[in-house]
Amino acid sequence: MAAFLLRHVSRHCLRAHLNAQLCIRNAAPLGTTAKEEMERFWKKNTSSNRPLSPHLTIYKWSLPMALSVCHRGSGIALSGGVSLFGLSALLLPGNFESYLMFVKSLCLGPTLIYSAKFVLVFPLMYHSLNGIRHLLWDLGKGLAIPQVWLSGVAVVVLAVLSSGGLAAL
């Protein structure tokens, strides 16, 4: 029985290769191209004067929403900062000590140095603490709306306090 089935399939495949019409008869022509569909979409949207969806002006901003945007932004800033620091360490002449001595020779005030250190460390602390918050969410903890707000406030307060402490070192 298997031999008959194998022979039938082999003959069918051989006929398909020899007769190109078998392949073409199953092809269906496309009604429109992607470019035509895109043009039709934009024409319809511009004629109806609707904003793009989702449009940011229709949302009422809340703390969890702002913290989510800031978490993404701090991740991008940290990634860019580390990449820039690594590239500058490779490409700039001298070593880290020479640049540190240059900054010390500028005789900047302690308030300016503290502020600069705070600005540098705050994104790291915020992103780290908010990342722990997201890991807790992944475990299913703290997903009720009041808990989301409370954990958001806690992350901001802890980030400010820990950044202030680290900047004071």
From Swiss-Prot:
Membrane-anchoring subunit of succinate dehydrogenase (SDH) that is involved in complex II of the mitochondrial electron transport chain and is responsible for transferring electrons from succinate to ubiquinone (coenzyme Q). SDH also oxidizes malate to the non-canonical enol form of oxaloacetate, enol-oxaloacetate. Enol-oxaloacetate, which is a potent inhibitor of the succinate dehydrogenase activity, is further isomerized into keto-oxaloacetate. Pfam families: Sdh_cyt (PF01127). The heme b is bound between the two transmembrane subunits SDHC and SDHD. Residues 93-112, 167-169 are mitochondrial intermembrane. It comes from the Eukaryota. GO terms for molecular function: electron transfer activity; heme binding; metal ion binding. The gene is Sdhc. Heme b binds at residue 127. Residues 1-29 form a transit peptide. The keyword Lipoprotein does not apply. Its cofactor is heme b. This is Succinate dehydrogenase cytochrome b560 subunit, mitochondrial.
